[in-house]
Amino acid sequence: MSEKGRLFTSESVTEGHPDKICDAVSDSVLDALLAADPRSRVAVETLVTTGQVHVVGEVTTTAKEAFADITNIVRERILDIGYDSSDKGFDGASCGVNIGIGAQSPDIAQGVDTAHEARVEGAADPLDAQGAGDQGLMFGYAINDTPELMPLPIALAHRLSRRLTEVRKNGVLPYLRPDGKTQVTIAYEDRVPVRLDTVVISTQHADDIDLVKTLDPDIREQVLKTVLDDLAHDTLDASAVRVLVNPTGKFVLGGPMGDAGLTGRKIIVDTYGGWARHGGGAFSGKDPSKVDRSAAYAMRWVAKNVVAAGLAERVEVQVAYAIGKAAPVGLFVETFGSEAVDPVKIEKAIGEVFDLRPGAIIRDLNLLRPIYAPTAAYGHFGRTDVDLPWERLDKVDDLKRAI
C-alpha cells in the first residue's frame, strides 16, 4: 500500500474519441428508428477508420423512412461531434458510409416475443410474454461519494471530459479538436476519498499550438480549475494534485485517422470506471429488449434508490437472465459492510418493490423512446446534465416501507 493512501483510478473520453463516435452513431440510428417505431428491434454496430464509417447489425422495424435515412443520420452525428474538416482528420460530410444491416434472427425473436413462461408454462400475465433477448448478467452500483451517488473518480473524470468538449464547442479554446481523454487518480483512506493525487488530460489540438505556453496553462485554467471549483467535495483535498497535460507531447493526429473505433469498446467508461463489476455487455446501438442495456439501467435504478433510502452507504446488485425467459434467474445484493439493515431484508425489499422482468423494466422506465443518443458519451449513470429515468429516486419510500 502506498504511504499516500490507497490510489484508485478511473478514466473518461470525449465524444470525439473513435470508440465514442461509434457509440454515438449506433445510438443515433437507434433513436431515429425508435422515434418512428417504438417497437423497433435494433442491434447496430459501428466501425470507424480513416475516411470510412461502417454500420452493420440487425434491425426489424416499420420505420422505413428512418431506415432509408441512416447514411444521413450517420453524417449528421459525426458533424455534430465536430469532425467537419479533413484538417481535423475526419469529415462527416465527405467520409464514406457503408451500411450492412439485416433483419433480427427469427430464432431470437421468438424468445423475446413469446417468453418461455407463456409458451411452455402457460402464464397469462402480459409481462410474462416478453422474454430476455439474451442470457447474461448485469450489475448496478451506487455509493454516497457524490450527490449523484457515483464513485468519485469516474464522476470527476466525466466532468473533465464534458468540460473539454464544452470549451471547444463554445469557443473558449477554439484550437481544441474533438478527440480527448481524461484520467483521475484519488487517494482513499478507510473508503473515504481524501486527496486528488493525479489528473491526466490528453486533448487533440491544432498543429500550431505551443504545448507549454498555451495548451498546458489553458487546460489547467479553463478545464481543471473550473471543474474543481464546481466540485466542492467535503473530504477531497485537491491542493497538491499532479497535473499531466498531453504527457506524450503534441496530439494533432486524432479521431478515426489516429485509431480505428468500434461500438461497445468503452464499457468501463460507460458505467462505474472500474469501481464496480461489469457483466460484459455493451449498451449503445441496442434497443431495450436487449437486457444488456435495459437490465443494467434497472440495476442502477435499484442501487441508487437503495442508497438514497439509507439502507446502505454503497451497494452493488446483480441480476441474471436466461434467453427467452421473462423472470430473472438470479438476484444478488452486496453492501460491502455498509448496510444499515440486514442485507437479506434489502434483497427481499428489492424483490417486492422492483419488477425485473424485461417487459416491466421497459414499462416502468418508459424505455421505448429516443432517449439514448445523449448517453453515448460521458457515461450512462450519474448524469447531472440529462434527465434519465433510471437516475430517478422514485422508489425510496417504497423501499423504506418494504423494510
Curated annotation (Swiss-Prot):
Region: Flexible loop, residue numbers: 104-114
Superkingdom of this protein's organism: Bacteria
Residues binding K(+), per UniProt: E45
GO terms under cellular component: cytoplasm
Catalytic EC class: transferase
Record-linked Pfam families: S-AdoMet_synt_C (PF02773), S-AdoMet_synt_M (PF02772), S-AdoMet_synt_N (PF00438)
PROSITE patterns, sorted: ADOMET_SYNTHASE_1, ADOMET_SYNTHASE_2
Chain positions recorded as L-methionine binding sites: E58, Q104, D259, K290
TM helices/strands, residue ranges: none
Lineage: Bacteria, Bacillati, Actinomycetota, Actinomycetes, Mycobacteriales
The protein's name: S-adenosylmethionine synthase
Annotated keywords: ATP-binding, Cytoplasm, Magnesium, Metal-binding, Nucleotide-binding, One-carbon metabolism, Potassium, Transferase
Gene3D superfamilies: 3.30.300.10
Record-listed ATP binding positions: H17, D179, G180, K181, K250, F251, D259, R265, K266, A282, K286
One GO biological process term: one-carbon metabolic process
The keyword Magnesium appears for this protein: yes
Biochemical pathway: Amino-acid biosynthesis; S-adenosyl-L-methionine biosynthesis; S-adenosyl-L-methionine from L-methionine: step 1/1
Reactions the enzyme catalyzes: L-methionine + ATP + H2O = S-adenosyl-L-methionine + phosphate + diphosphate
NCBIfam families (UniProt xref): metK
